[in-house]
Every structure is written in C-alpha cells, then in structure tokens.
Amino acid sequence: VAVGRQEVPAPYFGAKSAGDRPLVEVWTGSEWQLQRSTVPDGTAEAQLAGVDCASSSACVAVGTVAGRSGKDRVLTQFWDGSAWKVVVLPRSRSTEDPALYDVACTSPTACTAVGHRTYELGEFLSLIAPLILRWDGHEWSFEPSANNGNLRETELGGIACPSTQRCIAVGSERQADGTKSPFAEVRDGASWYVMRTSDPKGTPDAELYDVACPSLQRCIAVGFYAKGPDARPLIQSWDGAGWTTVPAPSPPGASSSVLTTIACDAPDHCLAGGIYRSTSPTEHAYSARWDGTTWTIVPMPGGIGSA
C-alpha cells in the first residue's frame, strides 16, 4: 500500500480553489490500483503521509486534515479488507496544528503513530514538540514524549516497531542557533526515552526522516545533512548500544541528494529511497541497497539517468 496526496480541482470538498485529497494505491501483484479514501466532515484539504499493514485486511494510514475553519487536525484511516474508514482522535486543548508523518503496527491492535504538535507556553511563545499516538484496536490515546519538557523544538518523522513493546522513532531537534540535528526516541515498555544520536562531522544541519528495524538490536535511519548550500544523504545505524554514521552513496553527478524512506526485511537486506538534483532544479528519484556490508546505488525508472 502506498499513500500520499493528489491535487484536485475546486469543486472537491466544496472549496473555491484547488486543493489536496488523500491518495491511496494498492499493489495487486501485477499493477497498482487506486482505492477510495474517506475524510471527516468539514474537510478543506487532506493528505496521507505514512501507512503500515499488520495483515492484508488490517492497514493504518496517517496524515493531516485542514478544516474549513482553518484548523489542522490529524487524520487516521483504517483498512478492514473492504474499505477505508476514518477514526476520530481525542482532542487536546494543549495541542495546536498537529500532524502525523508515520505509523508502525505489530498487530491489528498495536500501532504507534508519530509526528509533531504545537503547544503554547505563553501569550507570545509556542514550541513544536513530538506527537505520539497509540492504537489498541479500539481507540487512539496520547503517549507523552520523553522530550516534552525540553525548550528546544523537536519533531518525529519516522517510526519502526520491532516488537509490541519496543519502538524507535527518529526526527530532528532545533538548536539554539536555528540549525537542526538528528533526534531519536525509544519506547521500551510503557515509557519513551531520548536516545543519543550521532551528529555528522563538519555539518551545521542534519535531519532524520525514516527508520527501519530488522531486529530488536538493529535499526537504520535515513535523512540528510547540509554541505554548504546543498544536501547530502545521511544514513545512521543503531547496534543496540549507540548510533553511528555510515557512508551513504549519492547518485553520479548529483549536486544535492536526500534519503526520505527505508525498508528492511533482514539485517543484511535494506532498500532506501529518496530524491536528488544535478545541474538543473528538476528532482529525480533514486534508491540505494544495503547488502550487510556496503550501500550501493540501484537504478530505477524515472530516476538516475532519466530526464
């Protein structure tokens, strides 16, 4: 299952201008098929950012809804084998402009979604903090992030759960000078803890976008780090004790490249995907494969070498 957004003309949602609606496509084994998704009443725009499936009849997709009142809300949809259905989330007075970016499920009754929320510290001060939600098969509940008391802004963009009680989430933390650095939290049992990440040497800016955990003691996260005005792919590996930065390949001729997603079916078999630019501003897709020893570029349609 793949999710995202699709721009639609003005009549959709009753809006006066073009906007986004959720996009859901399913691979049947031979082709991609479009599926109909639903949104809450009063929606102006909506998009999906992450999806995970515990079985062929149990999938969860998460994203963001913009209401006609101008307020953003998180969007969660469930696939029961026949249709996508919206599940309403609990409201929180302390949470403004929330967004969900990714979700991980270990069973139909155990899913965790991550993103960010904005909360007010006073009349003129607000901060961005991690948003973590837990699904128990009946309803969503808020889980406190380990970083809620930190005055530095943090958000989570990717999550992987190698077991029901253990999840790793990655994202970024804004520093005092305005730059960002890799940020990660781990759920071990019932509580979340901040993990010490690895900062790439010689860079003022870096973020992690996604993570995959092929085992309890092995996780790989991807993102980017800044090199002058350009971006370079960032790959970090966790061995159960700490995070380390590992060499990441860039496409030949790339002036800027970023890895945005990763999936692993074994500790020695992972595939990461992202985008790159060369001399023109046009973006191309690219992918890289991990064989247990090194990362190598994998040619793909519409990617490396394509116009």
Segments predicted by a language model, with ranges:
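Residue-level hotspots at or immediately adjacent to binding/recognition sites across diverse folds
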Residues: 1-307
